[in-house]
């Protein structure tokens, strides 16, 4: 079978397009969204498209009471939307009653829900790009405990999300909670090794000088590909 390759012209081909592309970034995921947008804009300009950005401005402002709302600042009607959210980004803060609070994974997920609410019913399709899978370490029940990740995926499906894209899920079998929804688990093994070789050029991968440490039993499968 011949190797299939897709170039910018194929990616933005009108007859193959589902709808106009749009990107949304939850608080804390702006950097990743901007990087993706930069590649998309460059590809679009290579084929003569006059576009400055695919990002639709959005925000999740908070009231003095601590409540928040999702705000999308442009029309998304009929768009193919990709929403970026990073539940593991603890550097995002907000002030509440004189105290600086850091966003927890629960806060990040709730911001995602707010933005989905803001565009649902208008967008052609909604996909979520979540580098760190929300609740990914609570994927199975061994005692009287919650199943946060499975229920979160079911909640997103119920809200109209068609596709989840995540990286190196703790246990990708959690996709069984939503068998009819697309779930893409991308393994970043190549990118990790590429970055390692770039920053540590004298690294030695021989068995006498190199050791891979797995943080827990569930991570051994992912590390085996290294």
How should each PLM-predicted stretch be described?
Residues 1-225:
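PRPP-associated nucleotide enzymes
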């Amino acid at each position: 079978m011949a190797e299939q390759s897709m170039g910018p012209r194929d990616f933005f081909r009108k007859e193959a397009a589902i709808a106009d592309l749009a990107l949304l970034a939850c608080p804390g995921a702006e950097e990743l969204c901007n990087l993706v947008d930069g590649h998309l804009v460059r590809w679009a300009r290579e084929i003569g498209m006059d576009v400055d950005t695919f990002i639709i401005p959005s925000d999740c402002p908070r009231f003095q009471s601590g409540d928040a709302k999702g705000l999308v600042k442009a029309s998304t009607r009929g768009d193919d939307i990709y929403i970026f959210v990073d539940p593991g980004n603890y550097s995002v803060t907000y002030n509440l009653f004189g105290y600086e609070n850091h966003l927890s994974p629960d806060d990040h997920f709730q911001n995602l829900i707010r933005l989905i609410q803001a565009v649902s019913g208008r967008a052609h399709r909604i996909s979520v790009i979540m580098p760190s899978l929300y609740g990914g370490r609570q994927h199975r029940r061994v005692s009287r405990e919650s199943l946060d990740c499975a229920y979160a995926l079911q909640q997103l499906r119920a809200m109209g999300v068609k596709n989840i894209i995540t990286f190196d899920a703790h246990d990708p079998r959690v996709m069984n909670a939503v068998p009819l929804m697309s779930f893409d688990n991308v393994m970043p093994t190549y990118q990790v090794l590429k970055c390692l070789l770039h920053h540590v050029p004298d690294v030695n991968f021989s068995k006498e000088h190199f050791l891979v440490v797995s943080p827990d039993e569930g991570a051994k499968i992912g590390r085996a590909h290294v």
